[in-house]
């Protein structure tokens, strides 16, 4: 499980280097969530989830507010949520989640990123079955035993809690994301280093040499695409 957290941590660290791009992607995601229902996060669970995620990436409040205000307007811009599955070098598996207002453009861009960087797009379901959809929370200032006791007292079940890198990492069922989060907040835990629903690989693989270089180029190319929101994979990366 530690390696899985290391991969998530590495992904967050790499994205922190391109704040403007991250802010733009969250702006779209917040807009879509607000447009899909009530633009009030207190009554719109999907919107509340996206905002909580955005906070762990230090997205400024004015960007969040601007996206919500835009959703309150009369614009009818439509976005589609898409998932692409594929393969990289030497058994590596990749899942790409996108949010787009132009499906043809996004499909073409993702396919080109795969083909130009030694990968191949697969059909729906060709990769996802090797990943588990998982709610993940990172909490500083508490250890795993403390959080386990806290959650047990609140009658909240989770998959696992581990101490990693000076913080406790909680793994739970995706449908329990809000239940776990509200339980933690009721206990006075308001800040999270991570608050995500991630596709976690059931097994990690290691790459080296040219295979690793090709894989990293492929991941960079996919994450750089305007419409791509998340990229998951099964490669163990170094901290």
Swiss-Prot record:
It comes from the Bacteria. Belongs to the TACO1 family. YeeN subfamily. One of its GO terms (molecular function) is DNA binding. GO terms for biological process: regulation of DNA-templated transcription. One of its GO terms (cellular component) is cytosol. The keyword Cytoplasm applies. It is found in: Cytoplasm. This is Probable transcriptional regulatory protein lmo0369. Its main location: cytoplasm. Coiled coil: none annotated. The keyword Transcription regulation applies. NCBIfam families: PRK00110.1, PRK12378.1, YebC/PmpR family DNA-binding transcriptional regulator. Keywords: Cytoplasm, DNA-binding, Transcription, Transcription regulation. It holds the Pfam family Transcrip_reg. InterPro entries: Integrase-like_N, TACO1_YebC-like_2nd/3rd_dom, TACO1_YebC_N, Transcrip_reg_TACO1-like, Transcrip_reg_TACO1-like_dom3, Transcrip_reg_TACO1_YeeN, YebC-like.
